[in-house]
Amino acid sequence: MYDDIFFYLALWVIQSVYGAWDWAKNWVFWTCSYLLNFLYHHHCSRDLIRRDTKKLKKKPKHIAVIIECVEDGGIEGLIHDACELSAWCVCSNIRELTIYERKGFLKQSPEAVEKAIYSHLPFYLGGDKCTVHVTNPCSPDEKNQNDCVDLKVHLIAKEDGRDAIIDLTRGLADLCTKKVISSTQVTLELIDKELKESVIPEPDLLIIFAPLLKLQGFPPWQLRLCEIFHDPILYTTNYLTFFKALVHYSNAEMRLGH
């Protein structure tokens, strides 16, 4: 009987100590994160953002982000996040941005997103001109668009992930059945080319703005050589997490299997 009491008492003490330590650790992390968020706030200044990113050893040419539609923000919140991310990319001289929103709310209105971005950029750029093109990669109207822009924004959703691979597999199988192509012509290079053309080019860096580290159905083919960054504390769309992701990419070693 006394052994049982001692066991439960020891277990309670261990759990209490661990709980207190975990709470203290999280409090320190939260405090430091919000302090850094204040110190590294961009203040809608292109010069401040360029000062931050200028010292990086290397920067990604193509960034992908995962954002979520929250009840408080709705569609307007998603569009605002897209505008902020686009402005940060322009100020950081990053020319390609992919925005993944699982349910596809943004993807349904690329023209509205592009118009909102153009309205938002003057807060950062002042009177300087900047060309932005927002695309829905699955739309047939996007195939021949001019790439000579300051920023190209791709809007994708869950249907562009595994479903795109399944559709491509079915299409190639159908072509083989109809003798249009032979099975020997179905190579890794062909699949890679088709997926990049039908969805998006492979990003260099993926930033997950969500509470949990989940890919949420993001196109898996595009993540083979991609660096992934997630901040479990500051997980909403914010500049500090964006900048920390750039620092993470700058310090990463690309061994490519060696």
UniProtKB/Swiss-Prot annotation:
One of its GO terms (molecular function) is ditrans,polycis-polyprenyl diphosphate synthase [(2E,6E)-farnesyl diphosphate specific] activity. It is a single-pass membrane protein. One of its GO terms (cellular component) is endoplasmic reticulum membrane. It is found in: Endoplasmic reticulum membrane. Pathway: Protein modification; protein glycosylation. The keyword Membrane applies. It catalyses: n isopentenyl diphosphate + (2E,6E)-farnesyl diphosphate = a di-trans,poly-cis-polyprenyl diphosphate + n diphosphate. Its main location: endoplasmic reticulum. Keywords: Endoplasmic reticulum, Magnesium, Membrane, Transferase, Transmembrane, Transmembrane helix. Disulfide bonds: none annotated. Its EC number is 2.5.1.87. Its cofactor is Mg(2+). InterPro entries: Nus1/NgBR (IPR038887), UPP_synth-like_sf (IPR036424). One of its GO terms (biological process) is protein glycosylation. Belongs to the UPP synthase family. With SPAC4D7.04c, forms the dehydrodolichyl diphosphate synthase (DDS) complex, an essential component of the dolichol monophosphate (Dol-P) biosynthetic machinery. Adds multiple copies of isopentenyl pyrophosphate (IPP) to farnesyl pyrophosphate (FPP) to produce dehydrodolichyl diphosphate (Dedol-PP), a precursor of dolichol which is utilized as a sugar carrier in protein glycosylation in the endoplasmic reticulum (ER). Forms an active dehydrodolichyl diphosphate synthase complex with SPAC4D7.04c. This is Dehydrodolichyl diphosphate synthase complex subunit nus1. It comes from Schizosaccharomyces pombe (strain 972 / ATCC 24843) (Fission yeast). The gene is nus1.
